[in-house]
Amino acid sequence: MSKTIVLSVGEATRTLTEIQSTADRQIFEEKVGPLVGRLRLTASLRQNGAKTAYRVNLKLDQADVVDCSTSVCGELPKVRYTQVWSHDVTIVANSTEASRKSLYDLTKSLVATSQVEDLVVNLVPLGR
């Protein structure tokens, strides 16, 4: 059974299904709906060289179709994913589960603020 992630935004629900998984990286893609606009999420968890910290990276890409009739990629259109969002978190390796949960809660709270929404949506620097 494939793993899935369900994203609920307003009235819409979008389901991403795991298509690839390794020890430190998973890729989830949207499999239903129009091809243009489908989402792909890449999640990775890697330890730094000194093994003192972990880096969590989430990257969201959105599908578009490239017209190949006028280029060298052949006759048929091809799907191209373009990064539309990413989020990086660094976690101290010897942290406790409680401190990591607190970091997660703080991150979730920060991203939900109107100031961060204004920064992301309207490109208004924080504090202005």
Swiss-Prot record:
Primary localisation category: virion
The keyword Disulfide bond appears for this protein: yes
Substitution effect: R40L: Loss of translational repressor activity
Gene Ontology CC, one term: T=3 icosahedral viral capsid
Record has RNA-binding as a keyword: yes
Binding site for RNA: R40, R46, A53, R55, K59, D61, V84, S86, T90
GO biological process, any: regulation of translation
Top-level taxon of origin: Viruses
A GO MF label: identical protein binding
Result, substituting T90 to A/V: Loss of translational repressor activity
Localization, UniProt: Virion
Annotated phenotype, changing A53 to L/P: Loss of translational repressor activity
InterPro entries in the cross-refs: Phage_PP7_CP, Phage_RNA-type_capsid
Keywords: Capsid protein, Disulfide bond, RNA-binding, T=3 icosahedral capsid protein, Translation regulation, Virion
Family named by the database record: Belongs to the Leviviricetes capsid protein family.
Function: Capsid protein self-assembles to form an icosahedral capsid with a T=3 symmetry, about 26 nm in diameter, and consisting of 89 capsid proteins dimers (178 capsid proteins). Involved in viral genome encapsidation through the interaction between a capsid protein dimer and the multiple packaging signals present in the RNA genome.
Quaternary structure note: Homodimer. The dimers in the capsid are covalently linked with disulfide bridges. The homodimers binds to the viral RNA via an operator hairpin, but also to many other RNA sequences in the viral genome; this interaction probably shifts the virus from the replicative to the assembly phase and ensures specific encapsidation of the viral genome.
Protein name (record): Capsid protein
Species annotation: Pseudomonas phage PP7 (Bacteriophage PP7)
